[in-house]
Amino acid sequence: MSGSAIATARRAFLGMSHSPLLGLNPVAADDQIAIDKAIAAARAAVHEFAPELIVLLGPDHYNGFFNELMPPFCIGSQATAVGDYLSPAGPLNVAGELAIALADHLMDRHFDIAVSRRMLVDHGFSQALQFLWGDEMDTPPVIPIFMNAVAQPGIARMARCKALGEGVGSFLDQLPLRTLLIGSGGLSHEPPVPTLAHPDPAVRERITVRSTPTEQERELKTERVKAAGLALAHGDSWMKPLNPEWDLQWMDAMASGQLDGLCAMNEASIGAMAGNSAHESKTWLVARSALPANTRLSCPVRAYRAIPSLIAGYGVMFMHH
């Protein structure tokens, strides 16, 4: 389709991996060029589409949501980015009334959804906005939807993610707004995110009780994650390696709209094959499910690189309808 088709579309999907190590860890020159080109192409497509509303699906990495109360999904009527790593801090331009209206709509459809009136988000949300609209995150109105991707057993299953996306889509059908749905996360990766199985009780406490880390604690975490990425790149890491085959199959499903096949996927196989944090890829599934399923949409932007130093199977994909 021509570029003008983007400008006349009513709904668009952007799947975009995130990595807090972008700009911190070294990346091979050809990989960096590919990432920069993909992000630039996505930014150009998004600005040509000119969304009037954004629905942003993202995970958290124990910066805003903790195990003391961890919902599978949560809509924010107000949201602030904490500014971890190189991501910007500050308030998101949240469409508060529409966020509450979406929650009402989902509840009426028997999809129980949590609501936060003071959501804190990290790079899992803000990096996509930063790359598309700059450090000031001067965006169109946003409805942020958090998705738990780290804390079992409350990680939503595939079919539930698809159902949420369909519910969001039916809500958007009632609005005369050009809407961009962003899934921020994935693809295959297993960064050093602790779990409640960690042997150190202090670590278990840190991921359970809500707290604000000190600047020193943030710096130590950044250095720890940077070292993990370098170890993975050098092949001497305990972390699960990236899985480009899994990633490309996931992107193929997004492109074709054949989402029922993903819903039939064995849940345990996700972590086993693609790493524990590959559950973040479900943000793509929710966003894609708000567009017509079983339909191959126009896809002017698609790029992928497996980059161990970033601990990321890094994919970017833009489609419109």
UniProtKB/Swiss-Prot annotation:
Catalytic residues identified in the record: 123 (proton donor), 189 (proton acceptor)
The protein's required cofactors: Fe(2+)
GO MF annotation, one: 3-carboxyethylcatechol 2,3-dioxygenase activity
Biological processes per GO annotation: 3-phenylpropionate catabolic process
EC top class named in words: oxidoreductase
Function: Catalyzes the non-heme iron(II)-dependent oxidative cleavage of 2,3-dihydroxyphenylpropionic acid and 2,3-dihydroxicinnamic acid into 2-hydroxy-6-ketononadienedioate and 2-hydroxy-6-ketononatrienedioate, respectively.
Quaternary structure annotation from Swiss-Prot or TrEMBL: Homotetramer.
Family of this protein: Belongs to the LigB/MhpB extradiol dioxygenase family.
Designated name of the protein: 2,3-dihydroxyphenylpropionate/2,3-dihydroxicinnamic acid 1,2-dioxygenase
Organism for this UniProt entry: Comamonas testosteroni
Lineage: Bacteria, Pseudomonadati, Pseudomonadota, Betaproteobacteria, Burkholderiales
